[in-house]
Amino acid sequence: MPQLSTTTRVRHAASEMFDLVADVERYPEFVPLCQSLDVRQRSTDGGKHVIVADMTVAYKLIRQTFTSRVTLDRAKLEILVEYLEGPFRSLNNHWTFRPVDEHACDVDFFISYEFRSRALGLLMGAMFDAAFRRFAGAFEGRADQVYGTRAA
């Protein structure tokens, strides 16, 4: 099962990065391969906000839509993404934002996935790997656009 785990230090507050990643409806504007995202449901569970959303990813002529539950834990600065339905056998994704100081944080990103179809995995696997490796940079770039850049 392919997986990727990265830690990136960014020049933005942990709360800012949490808010940016939590704003799933903006993903089509900057997340690699994300063509659309539709929120199905919003709720609160034990002080955590929960979003159920459909994300459509597209690459050339291939389009796949999958549904995930996104749990936003602002108190812990953690975001958990749980796969519900779509072309994957499994998909697990989580983010943790660890403050370094008031203007910087470490962003921990983890994702593992396995396509249900071997053929789809062969067709899209390498492209997904490349896209996921660009995720941290895409979010950092978006943070620079939204919050401005800060000197190191």
What are these regions (language model features)?
Residues T7-R11, D38, T56, R69-T71, ...:
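Generic structural detector for well-ordered beta-strands
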Residues M1-K48, E102, T149-A152:
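Hydrophobic ligand-binding cavity/cleft-lining segments
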Residues M17-F18, Y27, A53, V70, ...:
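Hydrophobic pocket/interface hotspot
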Residues E25, F132, A136, E140-Y147:
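Short amphipathic alpha-helical signal-transduction/dimerization elements
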Residues L80-R134:
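Beta-strand/loop substructures that line and gate deep hydrophobic ligand-binding cavities in soluble
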Residues S15, W95, G137:
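Short alpha-helical basic/polar micro-motif
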Residues V39-E85, A138-R142, R150:
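Glycine-rich portal/gate segments that line the openings of hydrophobic small-molecule binding cavities
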Residues Q3-S5, R63-T67, S90-N93:
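Short, surface-exposed coil-to-beta transition loops
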